[in-house]
Amino acid sequence: MSSTLREASKDTLQAKDKTYHYYSLPLAAKSLGDITRLPKSLKVLLENLLRWQDGNSVTEEDIHALAGWLKNAHADREIAYRPARVLMQDFTGVPAVVDLAAMREAVKRLGGDTAKVNPLSPVDLVIDHSVTVDRFGDDEAFEENVRLEMERNHERYVFLKWGKQAFSRFSVVPPGTGICHQVNLEYLGKAVWSELQDGEWIAYPDTLVGTDSHTTMINGLGVLGWGVGGIEAEAAMLGQPVSMLIPDVVGFKLTGKLREGITATDLVLTVTQMLRKHGVVGKFVEFYGDGLDSLPLADRATIANMSPEYGATCGFFPIDAVTLDYMRLSGRSEDQVELVEKYAKAQGMWRNPGDEPIFTSTLELDMNDVEASLAGPKRPQDRVALPDVPKAFAASNELEVNATHKDRQPVDYVMNGHQYQLPDGAVVIAAITSCTNTSNPSVLMAAGLLAKKAVTLGLKRQPWVKASLAPGSKVVSDYLAKAKLTPYLDELGFNLVGYGCTTCIGNSGPLPDPIETAIKKSDLTVGAVLSGNRNFEGRIHPLVKTNWLASPPLVVAYALAGNMNINLASEPIGHDRKGDPVYLKDIWPSAQEIARAVEQVSTEMFRKEYAEVFEGTAEWKGINVTRSDTYGWQEDSTYIRLSPFFDEMQATPAPVEDIHGARILAMLGDSVTTDHISPAGSIKPDSPAGRYLQGRGVERKDFNSYGSRRGNHEVMMRGTFANIRIRNEMVPGVEGGMTRHLPDSDVVSIYDAAMRYKQEQTPLAVIAGKEYGSGSSRDWAAKGPRLLGIRVVIAESFERIHRSNLIGMGILPLEFPQGVTRKTLGLTGEEKIDIGDLQNLQPGATVPVTLTRADGSQEVVPCRCRIDTATELTYYQNDGILHYVIRNMLK
């Protein structure tokens, strides 16, 4: 009997006197042909298929198809990918654990074994999304924000602690430790994984999926990983492979070096703009070129982090000497570092100088051409050169709904006994935040050095600026303190407020009352400047209409200037004690100064801070839970509720019903984000979710955020399409989650309309433009629509994760034909929609959509089914991916 490719490729290597078995790509190449120039990222996928070859989910044909990608730099084949582990954060992790607990209830009800609902691969959940910047600008901010976080989220944390003991291979990193992607980069990521199987040590690439779109950051370490929706991650941890098409790979060649005064943030904003323009949705991006020789790993991680912003599945940096240097610096063992080097070289995954893999397409950037930049005011791909920021701000201001920019005069306000004037264009939030940049010592040290020079000259933060520092790990605090820069940041109001995502995800906290009142009084257009990765409308703060991504030193600079209308490249940032003008160039640190400061970062800092990473504070340790396999649901809970998704589920799926007489619930434009669909930030008292909470006895001060209440479907379905900046074209001139209920045309909230349609047994549809579902990976942007009764979303194009999430919740994604849009069709939202023959649906097929207009006339539009693979079709036919997983467990 002939051996399989898997068996024939098994080999051994030695690292630190230890023998490891592995599945050798060079040995497999004897059957597959020359794969030397296969992109390194695809070599990781190839090893995955080789190792998991079973003749069923992974066949020899699958392996040959991936190796054969080289012929056309493209392959039309579905493959089953099994990541080594799963990463979660608490906003997506809580609903995932709710789903797992609900799945146990469903399996129990249907007569199955609840023990089968258990992760088969390691899962790390890092609590980082819950801390809010309530207090800022003083030495007590950190302790107060931590206290409030524990107070508000106690029930959620009890639930996560229950999950930790109820599920195997499930670890929780407690609050106040850091941001999941930075913890992953600095500690959890291994680059090469090893485990004992049948008495042999097996080595294989570290790979993962995560329930956060910025999971891609780990690609900077040479670890292949990307974000998926919570439902897909749950399926993966329960042993279900990730179904995917073999991706195209775009090569991005980096040459040269960054000039003096240019940061990694400027570089990533440039890369993001270039790749968004090139078009990389659903594709891998792999970086190569001699520019990588001098590109620090922290800079690579910054670029990899923003893969969702440029639209790629991942932005991959192959393993090389820079990778090993970072692993040593961050405290990985020498045994692990040697294994990574020997494995990567043995497998052809090591980056050598001059490597030129074959790519589907390529771009090139000479880093010497990168200029100081921000991105804004509403999209991360909209890069603006520093001198052009005032012009970009003015242009966005003119476009605001109901804008009366020319009439907006500065507003007088009193704070702390002093009178000030708040101008239009004021910077009201300046936040050093987000793993994108706080994982990078060079830009953090640059911010501290700029603060030192500013304080020395007597510059002060403008009084209306809410400043904050929220690093992604405690190591940052250690090295800023070692470099003696913390006092200067504190002096300018950049006191430590927490170790978590904070402002970047919308947890910026309230502005001081006088500031909020002044903004509302004259409808001022104000700005937030943050070192984050997202700046979508309504995300950072409900009253802040323009949000700008910038490097940490520029964040400090804008806190000093206090106004988006100032040209920091040519106008004074302030005045020194003598009254002389001070320019940005006067306080910008030199490359040498930054390099000297970065030398303070040491291996001991990483080892000290990660020695007890799973332990937590005394408050966390004090949370006691009762051991049990199933959760004790509390009927009066407003945080954790048994989700209804499996309530009516049977052991055998019913045939998919055709869609008859569907009404359009919302008609939306381009770049509608998952923030628009399912906001993460504050809950308005007069919103459907706010009214629900008040009806359950929750006071306004205890609302917390939508993100923190994702374990309660009642809140989340009411929060669907509730973003205050969403614009439904069915109600022109109105911002917020409103629509028209038809045929009576009553203008009501989207939630209220959906509930009326549900009573009338009317299925629902959403119509949209390009890039529907861009942004965060949040599965509630698919779960919420499902609970509202939405059966189909018809858009010009979809972002990758959201398309997958819709299918995972049993919602049909359809794409208009090329050149056809809601506008060319003249849609008003009053049309009815019919879609038939859904039982015979096929991946990628043309689906006739019948539109019946208000006057009774009809038009058939041939849309493209965006169920892309046979596996996805199976999920859809089962009413969702988790239903499919449960039914498999019952067999």
Swiss-Prot record:
Free-text disruption phenotype from the record: Cells lacking this gene are more sensitive to peroxide stress. The acnAB double mutant does not grow on unsupplemented glucose minimal medium and does not respond under aerobic conditions to glutamate. The acnAB double mutant retains a low but significant aconitase activity.
Pathway: Carbohydrate metabolism; tricarboxylic acid cycle; isocitrate from oxaloacetate: step 2/2
Cofactor remark from the record: Binds 1 [4Fe-4S] cluster per subunit.
Record-linked PROSITE patterns: ACONITASE_1 (PS00450), ACONITASE_2 (PS01244)
pH dependence: Optimum pH is 7.4. It retains a high specific activity over a broad pH range.
Gene3D superfamilies recorded: 6.10.190.10, Aconitase, domain 3 (3.30.499.10), Aconitase, domain 4 (3.20.19.10)
Miscellaneous section: The AcnA activity over a broad pH range might be a useful adaptation for specifically expression in the stationary phase, where the intracellular pH may vary over a wider range. AcnA is resistant to oxidation in vivo.
Name of protein: Aconitate hydratase A
Source organism (scientific name): Escherichia coli (strain K12)
